[in-house]
């Protein structure tokens, strides 16, 4: 973990540093444990490149790629040694040699690809935010069930081993009762160009779908049930998307969640989960592999290291392969994603944030 006194890296720089830290290390043999599927990716942006680089660490490759611009798909395939380049996504869906599809396109395009890929019998791992709203996600889940395929949300916190280990200990009663989850996420995005994806309503911009999904996912993972009460204040910009928000949630067990988000200021990506017996602090939580537990009785600090940041995207892909192989605990992750989407849909409605596809 980086020195806490240093300024945190932006996400791209952090990913690059993480990859460099494991470049010469053997890949763990406990990540990909289910039968290997043949994967194709839709989209050739930053996250698709990170996935290809992650797989290379494991000695694996994507089997195919499709992109709106064919030349970009061809260049991507050449860079990563991918065998198949599809002229259209329909060609990808029709290929019987592809088992699973990874969708990395802008948020507002996801449902179109989800409908077609799932109906074609492909398992799907879809980047966050998995859909624009709960109605779209419910539709995608129905299609997946009808065609007996796995749909999985690629929000990293749902798949990082650190959270699985902390939840295991929480469920075992090690920490006592969970009382309060506090999460911050501030990402400074220059406000001058309102056509960029962060502020562009036509690209489903805004803080909620881009960064809020991480904070709400961590919150929901540690709460015993979905919050029934949600109060908030949100700020929007002239394009109509949300740029900041303060959120307080409470569930039937009287557990509280407090979340702050902003695209106008840098904040630490910091989560503090407070229990009777301790509190757990996780910094840079979207791909975290380290947590500090501070015990109430004596102030002792326990350092927990589980998983590796550089393998974040491998954990996502491995979880889908495990779900396909019959691991119900991995299939259940979509339930948390659905709860988070329900919260985000309500919050955007409260703030008056409506995308063109929803009008």
Q: PLM features: residue spans?
A:
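Short active-site oxyanion
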Residues: 38, 60-64, 99-101, 205-206, ...
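Beta-strand-loop-alpha-helix segment that lines the small-molecule cofactor/substrate pocket
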Residues: 100, 106-107, 111-158
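NAD(P)-dinucleotide binding in Rossmann-like oxidoreductases
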Residues: 235-242, 251-321, 328-335
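Short acidic low-complexity segments
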Residues: 83-96
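C-terminal helix-rich "cap/oligomerization" subdomain common to oxidoreductases
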Residues: 1-33, 100-102, 252, 319-359
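Short, conserved SAM-binding/catalytic segment
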Residues: 75-82, 140-146
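N-terminal Rossmann-like dinucleotide-binding module
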Residues: 2-80
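Predominantly a Rossmann-like dinucleotide-binding segment in NAD(P)-dependent oxidoreductases
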Residues: 157-230, 238
């Amino acid at each position: 973990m980086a020195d806490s006194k240093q300024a945190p890296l932006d996400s791209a720089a952090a990913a690059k540093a993480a990859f460099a830290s494991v470049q010469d290390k053997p890949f763990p043999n406990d990540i990909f444990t289910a039968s290997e599927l043949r994967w194709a990716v839709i989209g050739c942006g930053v996250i698709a490149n990170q996935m290809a680089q992650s797989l290379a660490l494991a000695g694996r490759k994507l089997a195919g790629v499709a992109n709106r611009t064919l030349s970009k798909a061809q260049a991507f395939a050449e860079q990563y040694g991918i065998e198949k380049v599809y002229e259209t996504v329909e060609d990808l869906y029709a290929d019987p040699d592809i088992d699973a599809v990874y969708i990395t396109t802008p948020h507002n395009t996801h449902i179109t690809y989800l409908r077609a890929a799932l109906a074609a019998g492909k398992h799907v791992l879809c980047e966050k935010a998995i859909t624009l709203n709960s109605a779209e996600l419910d539709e995608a889940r129905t299609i997946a069930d009808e065609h007996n395929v796995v749909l999985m949300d690629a929000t990293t916190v749902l798949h990082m081993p650190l959270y699985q280990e902390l939840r295991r200990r929480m469920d075992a009663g090690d920490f006592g009762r969970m009382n309060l989850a506090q999460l911050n996420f501030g990402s400074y995005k220059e406000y001058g160009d309102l056509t960029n994806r962060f502020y562009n309503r036509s690209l489903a911009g805004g803080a909620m779908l881009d960064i809020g999904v991480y904070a709400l996912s961590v919150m929901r993972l540690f709460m015993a049930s979905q919050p029934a009460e949600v109060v908030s204040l949100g700020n929007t910009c002239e394009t109509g998307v949300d740029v900041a928000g303060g959120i307080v949630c409470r569930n039937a067990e009287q557990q509280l969640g407090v979340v702050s988000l902003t695209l106008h200021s840098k904040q630490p990506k910091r989560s503090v989960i407070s229990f009777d017996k301790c509190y757990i602090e996780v910094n840079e939580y979207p791909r975290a592999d380290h947590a500090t537990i501070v015990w109430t009785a004596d102030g002792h600090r326990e350092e927990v290291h589980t998983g590796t940041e550089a393998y974040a995207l491998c954990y996502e892909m491995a979880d889908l392969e495990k779900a396909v192989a019959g691991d119900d605990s991995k299939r259940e992750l979509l339930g948390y994603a659905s709860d988070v989407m329900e919260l985000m849909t309500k919050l955007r409605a409260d703030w008056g944030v409506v995308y063109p596809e929803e009008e």
